[in-house]
């Protein structure tokens, strides 16, 4: 991706994050609402941090939220972020963010002026790097560019007495979305010429570039994930999208004993229909690199097969290994601790062991669930049991329910 961006020049992003979230119906501004254990804005920052060609991320927040934002940056290890005090309106906040790059900026926070600046919303966490680059390149070529999406509903205008005045042709009109990008001089010059009315009541940055810098923006059809978290239901939708994204790959950790290998193979065959699955021997998992090098990207889901009755050694070793990393800071990790049992085994002792292990692991944002699989069966029955266990594992990974942590389920 860096090679594809090499002709772009220096690029930065401005994220206005000073909204109060009135439409959300919450006292907490929506950018700070928790989504899967993490503030929404942290997910948005992560999306931009993936693009190494973006050199600076300017987050504009209300003065009363500066300390909170600093704490979020520190806790989640965000990089390349500069905080700026916001204005009373969205446009005034964006203008404050742009001023950081100005040669006339007297504050110590002044940083190198970019050739291209991207403007995005802190409450739009789902932005693809490929599309970001497409918008930025179009802005460099044309002066301005922005994402659009088809209108979902027809837009109508009402008369002063509440009757239909006219409607817009939906096939011709589009919804303006984020991200938008500009040559820095184009958008900064436009904001310098804005009236107070523009700064207080305006909504469209692309229009400011057209009105004050005489630059027509190139409009690009964006992907469907560009939606904005506006209402409370959107928080649930955002959490579902994130859960789906971190549930794509799975690692099965097993030892070399015959029973573990057999069950591990059956689980692999069933789970590969739903996930990208890799199976590794527990003897290989001596360091986190052995696990994470299996995948291109972070693995958040693990199945650990324990053979010995009442033994949690394999699962405990995996928990200890994951706790040495920062992997669980960003997202909750799931470990399904599978225990191979026979008719004579005592599940009560296993239950207390799972709960104790899971309670400690949960403090590190690692969700441990227990699953019993009876191996004292013929081949056909075992296959059916493993198939039922696969359904349980799939539900646990998809839902990531902390209320079920430490529970021992039976396939």
UniProtKB/Swiss-Prot annotation:
GO terms for molecular function: cytidylyltransferase activity; D-ribitol-5-phosphate cytidylyltransferase activity; protein homodimerization activity. The record marks 170, 228 as: Positions substrate for the nucleophilic attack. Its main location: cytoplasm. The keyword Cytoplasm applies. Keywords: Cytoplasm, Nucleotidyltransferase, Transferase. Its EC number is 2.7.7.40. Coiled coil: none annotated. It holds the Pfam family ISPD_C. Pathway: Protein modification; protein glycosylation. InterPro entries: IspD/TarI, ISPD_C, ISPD_synthase_CS, Nucleotide-diphossugar_trans. It comes from the Eukaryota. One of its GO terms (biological process) is isoprenoid biosynthetic process. One of its GO terms (cellular component) is cytosol. SUPFAM superfamilies: Nucleotide-diphospho-sugar transferases. It catalyses: D-ribitol 5-phosphate + CTP + H(+) = CDP-L-ribitol + diphosphate; D-ribose 5-phosphate + CTP + H(+) = CDP-D-ribose + diphosphate; D-ribulose 5-phosphate + CTP + H(+) = CDP-D-ribulose + diphosphate. The record marks 23, 30 as: Transition state stabilizer. It is found in: Cytoplasm, Cytosol. PANTHER family: D-RIBITOL-5-PHOSPHATE CYTIDYLYLTRANSFERASE. Belongs to the IspD/TarI cytidylyltransferase family. IspD subfamily. Cytidylyltransferase required for protein O-linked mannosylation. Catalyzes the formation of CDP-ribitol nucleotide sugar from D-ribitol 5-phosphate. CDP-ribitol is a substrate of FKTN during the biosynthesis of the phosphorylated O-mannosyl trisaccharide (N-acetylgalactosamine-beta-3-N-acetylglucosamine-beta-4-(phosphate-6-)mannose), a carbohydrate structure present in alpha-dystroglycan (DAG1), which is required for binding laminin G-like domain-containing extracellular proteins with high affinity. Homodimer. This is D-ribitol-5-phosphate cytidylyltransferase. It comes from Xenopus tropicalis (Western clawed frog). The lineage of its organism: Eukaryota, Metazoa, Chordata, Craniata, Vertebrata.
């Amino acid at each position: 991706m860096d090679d594809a961006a090499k002709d772009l020049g220096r690029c930065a992003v401005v994220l206005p994050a000073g909204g109060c979230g009135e439409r959300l119906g919450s006292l907490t501004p929506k950018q700070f609402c928790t989504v899967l254990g993490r503030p929404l804005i942290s997910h948005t920052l992560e999306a931009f941090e993936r693009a190494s060609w973006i050199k600076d991320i300017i987050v504009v927040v209300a003065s009363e939220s500066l300390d909170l934002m600093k704490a979020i940056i520190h806790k989640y290890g965000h990089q390349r972020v500069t905080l700026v005090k916001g204005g009373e309106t969205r446009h005034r906040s964006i203008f404050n963010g742009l001023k950081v790059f100005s040669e006339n900026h007297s504050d110590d926070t002044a940083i190198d002026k970019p050739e291209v600046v991207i403007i995005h919303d802190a409450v739009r966490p789902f932005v693809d790097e490929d599309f970001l680059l497409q918008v930025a390149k179009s802005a460099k070529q044309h002066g301005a560019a922005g994402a659009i999406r088809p209108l979902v509903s027809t837009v109508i205008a009402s008369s002063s007495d509440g009757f239909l005045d006219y409607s817009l042709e939906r096939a011709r009109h589009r919804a303006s979305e984020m991200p938008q990008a500009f040559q820095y001089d184009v958008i900064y010059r436009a904001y310098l010429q804005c009236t107070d009315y523009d700064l207080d009541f305006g909504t469209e940055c692309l229009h400011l570039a057209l009105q004050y810098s005489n630059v027509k923006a190139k409009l690009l059809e964006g992907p469907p994930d560009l939606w904005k978290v506006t209402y409370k239901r959107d928080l649930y939708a955002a959490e579902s999208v994130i859960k789906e994204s971190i549930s794509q790959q799975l690692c099965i950790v097993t030892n070399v004993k015959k029973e573990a290998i057999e069950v591990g193979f059956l689980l692999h065959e069933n789970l590969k229909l739903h996930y990208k699955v890799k199976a590794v021997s527990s003897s290989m998992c001596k360091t986190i690199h052995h696990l994470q090098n299996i995948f291109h990207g972070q693995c958040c889901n693990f199945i650990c097969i324990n053979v010995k009755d009442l033994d949690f050694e394999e699962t405990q070793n995996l928990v200890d290994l994951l706790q040495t990393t920062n992997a669980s800071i960003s997202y909750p990790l799931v470990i399904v601790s599978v225990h191979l049992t026979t008719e004579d085994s005592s599940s009560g002792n296993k239950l207390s062991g799972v709960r104790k292990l899971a309670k400690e692991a949960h403090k590190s944002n690692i969700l441990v669930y227990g699953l019993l699989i009876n191996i004292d069966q013929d081949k056909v029955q075992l296959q059916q049991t493993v198939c039922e266990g696969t359904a349980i594992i799939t539900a646990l990974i998809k839902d990531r329910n902390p209320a079920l942590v430490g529970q021992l389920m039976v396939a």
